[in-house]
Amino acid sequence: MTSIQKFASPVLSRCVVALALALPMVAQAQTQTPVPTESGQVVGAQTPALPGDLSVVPAPGLTARAWLSMDVNSGQIIAAEGLNERVEPASLTKLMTAYLVFDALEAGRLKLDQTVVISDKAWRTEGSRMFVKVNSQVSVNDLLQGVIVQSGNDASVALAEAVAGSEGAFAALMNEEATKLGLTATHFVNSTGLPDPEHLTSVRDLGVLSAALVARFPQYLHYYSQKEYTYNNIKQPNRNRLLWLDNTVDGLKTGHTQSAGYCLVSTALRDGRRVVSVVVGTANDAARTENSLKLLNWSFQNFETVKLYDASNPAVTARVWEGELENVGLGTEGALWLTVPRGKSAEIKPVANYTQPLLAPLSKGDKVGTLTLSLDGKVLAEQPLLVLEDVPEAGFFGRMADKVRLMFE
């Protein structure tokens, strides 16, 4: 890295540090899906909000009403149309239904072999069905396959009641979780996706939810690649046709109502890199399949995701004053990945802006500035710049010596 350009005076000031103009070439992302913390926050991925400007690569021509492509490792939105337009999710709603069931399983509030008594309400729910019988006892494992593989509304209501006592209470939990995940355009009324004027989302929110589901619950991802399921002697195929067309695709969920059109959230893993695509409002099953495959292929072929920094590779090494250590690494929480057009990773420009002088004591995780990453003059990502290790305060004489040195800096 280039040497730090110092603009500090003896009083606190701001210092903009230009890092190496050309980062070393970084191998394409290894299999390292971002890991959620105990709070459910995904570490190792930026919070997706708006896409970085990747317009150097023309977007594919799609017929969907709204669509999105997102890289799960970096958390970046690669491209989108109608990003924040409020749309009907139809059975894509069941992504959140399953998310909350997975959360209950992880917390021990449910077990896969636990049986659920099917209520009259669940049995009578209209639309696509698993064909469970009223008052029968069905395992959570079977109901999950009914929701994910068969898109059964009856199974969705049964699981909602198992988690929260009623579908209404479950919808409240869905909205609470949506708020935690930052789903700003989303409001749920039911667990199924049956039409309601207030049951709405956006392709951005569906992308964020899907990326969080894949990252937080990889142990349950196998349900989404299951091609068929038989219950009550009725075999039903998974409606996601991509599972038969592309063996890198391992999810996620279809949706359809007359008002929502044909919708599909899909995800594929190729060479350790995972992409999620969302298409809503297409004309038919073939169109949603074609649009999704086209979007996935375009995203993989035209972009790469590189790992820039982690705890062992700080973004910058900064001088510390009045501490037991003379220097400390500054970096990001978890690994930092960035998605860029193929062949452009060496042109990423990182700039660290942090408070100078840095005075001990410092604690690991203290925010001291911002790391900005840009390409061709356009900002792609901004991350908090954090202290990567504790720096205790020096003894009396060490502090006094540094105070004198600072007078001449």
Language-model regions, residue ranges each:
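Domain-terminus/edge residues, biased toward the C-terminal soluble/receptor-binding domains
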Residues: 183-187, 195-200, 204-409
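Sec/Tat signal peptide C-region and signal peptidase I cleavage site
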Residues: 25-29
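Ubiquitous "structural anchor" signal
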Residues: 21, 105-106, 116, 263, ...
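Bacterial N-terminal signal peptides
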Residues: 14-24
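Bacterial N-terminal signal peptides that target proteins for export
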Residues: 2-16
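Active-site-adjacent loops and short helices of periplasmic peptidoglycan-processing enzymes
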Residues: 30-217, 228-232
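Sterically constrained small-residue positions within well-ordered secondary structures
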Residues: 10, 20, 58-60, 80, ...
